[in-house]
Regions:
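Unchanged
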Residues: 1-235
């Protein structure tokens, strides 16, 4: 299990403006909004990753990132560089585009050099503005056991409420057969017609699968370059 964690790169998407939290986000990105005193929203993703044994973490920043960068420097200084552990903040590098990130997938694509340099077995994509507790080792172990190209972390909610989320359809062996972003008529889980599986925005990919999907998506002018809308449905 430790080897799986060591060969996984975590990329936390932290570029959201958080317009619905204004004025809290007037001077900072949503992931750096304070939570319970000295903590920030980003600390949930950070704690989940650390408690899952993950020690290679890249925060993909863009919008008003100074507050977040300071929090990383002052509060996350726990890594040992000599053992290959790190947490770093990366903004648009200008290697593949001079523009700001155009979507969640584009944010990772513009930093594809980081993935290629690290050369992990898996890449775990997280959102830096989600509040939840999870052990990602279960996700890694499941992917290893199934030899899965991609795994999405999900939860069940009443089907009547699912139209606000990305909804996943699976077969009896829980292989993904459908994915729809905010569908008007959400499909139900096969084991219970009253609930639907929704995406939590946590994606685990085999690195070659992710790189191919990002390169293919980047060539599509009409794409919104979003994991939920474009990358996952294309797999």
């Amino acid at each position: 299990m430790e080897l799986l964690s060591r060969k996984t790169l975590v990329m936390v998407l932290c570029g959201g403006k958080g317009e619905r939290l204004y004025p809290l986000t007037r001077d900072r990105a949503k992931p750096s909004v304070p939570f319970l005193g000295s903590y920030r929203i980003i600390d949930f993703s950070r704690s989940n990753a650390l408690n899952s044994g993950l020690r290679k973490i890249a925060l993909v920043t863009q919008y008003k990132s100074l507050s977040l960068d300071r929090h990383i420097i002052n509060g996350w200084n726990i890594f040992h560089a000599e053992s290959g552990d790190y947490i770093l903040s990366i903004s648009a590098q200008g290697r593949v585009s001079d523009s700001w990130y155009e979507g969640t997938a584009d944010a990772v694509f513009q930093n594809i050099y980081t993935i290629q340099q690290e050369n992990p077995d898996h890449v775990l994509i997280l959102s830096g503005d989600h509040i939840y507790k999870a052990d990602y080792r279960r996700l890694l172990l499941y992917a290893e056991q199934k030899d899965a190209d991609a795994v999405i972390m999900t939860r069940t909610i009443p089907t009547a409420e699912a139209s606000r989320f990305g909804v996943i359809g699976v077969d009896d062996e829980r292989r993904i057969v459908e994915f729809a972003e905010k569908p008007k008529k959400p499909f139900a889980a096969p084991w219970d017609p009253s609930v639907s599986l929704i995406s939590m925005g946590v994606y685990l990919f085999k690195t070659p699968v992710l790189v191919r999907a990002l390169l293919k998506d980047a060539r599509k002018a009409a794409s919104s370059h979003d994991f939920g809308k474009d990358i996952i449905p294309s797999l």
